[in-house]
């Protein structure tokens, strides 16, 4: 089989399964509204959970940062790309979340890959929730360590896997809020079992940070858990992009030496770090509380109105509200019907989710209004 035949076969298989991914160029897509092909849609596919991507204070901070520092960082943080504003953001994140140190990364994917690649050796073991994000599972699969997966949120299964002999160290990996189901991990129970077996815990709280807990401190703070490694991202609750790893001073020093994604990547623009500082300020103050409270009300309105639809509603109290349809083709058709009626919704299919669980991944944001939720419910009931 030639290279082209190999590529064609893979694409043909995706097409046959109604699983071929496509991108749609949009003129506007992060907030309440999405604009595509000169048409405006109510946007129920954005991860901008607090509606901060268009916040004037954050936009102004980015502009001021660009005027002061330029539009790029100019290099890796180990060379010349680590500015005083990067340092200030790291210090503010560490203080906010109760850690000694924070290290900035260009994306959550890069942060997860960097930590696992740097920390794990051949004699070690990763025990990961089966539904962990692709960045975590791919990094675990590529690492020299042994990978074992436990049934989703099944602490008893996790305990059995941890109890089997391991010549090295054990790292338990999970998410705070799961990206495709919207449910939360039982972090306190997971941490207890992990500590009983002398392991470390790594939590990716991409979808909880900024959105839940006191001052938006996320899933771990809400459940009174402090993992050894906490990954937070800035493309969801913060409304920007990028990520950070929260850890001890010693672990931070170690990652600065051995995390290749950190060492060999151009750091985020200082202007972006300036915008993230402004976003963090909004998240922590009363305005952040008001946005979180509004989001909770919108979620409650949606869940109350969707109960009698002929779809499986995930057990989620988060901004992620999946309607599990099952069949790939049916999920695509339903998403298209909703778009025709002015609601932009994305169909998520395998391999992103398990086979037979194709779904509409609906996301609500504080930028929405109650009438937006009512319109979504009206359209769903008309196509249920």
From Swiss-Prot:
The keyword NAD does not apply. InterPro entries: Aminotrans_II_pyridoxalP_BS (IPR001917), Aminotransferase_I/II_large (IPR004839), AON_synthase_class-II (IPR050087), AONS_Archaea/Proteobacteria (IPR004723), AONS_Proteobacteria (IPR022834), PyrdxlP-dep_Trfase (IPR015424), PyrdxlP-dep_Trfase_major (IPR015421), PyrdxlP-dep_Trfase_small (IPR015422). Its cofactor is pyridoxal 5'-phosphate. The modification N6-(pyridoxal phosphate)lysine is found at residue 236. PROSITE patterns: AA_TRANSFER_CLASS_2. GO terms for biological process: biotin biosynthetic process. Keywords: Biotin biosynthesis, Pyridoxal phosphate, Transferase. It holds the Pfam family Aminotran_1_2. GO terms for molecular function: 8-amino-7-oxononanoate synthase activity; pyridoxal phosphate binding. It catalyses: 6-carboxyhexanoyl-[ACP] + L-alanine + H(+) = (8S)-8-amino-7-oxononanoate + holo-[ACP] + CO2. The keyword Transferase applies. Pathway: Cofactor biosynthesis; biotin biosynthesis. Belongs to the class-II pyridoxal-phosphate-dependent aminotransferase family. BioF subfamily. This is 8-amino-7-oxononanoate synthase. It comes from Shigella flexneri. The gene is bioF.
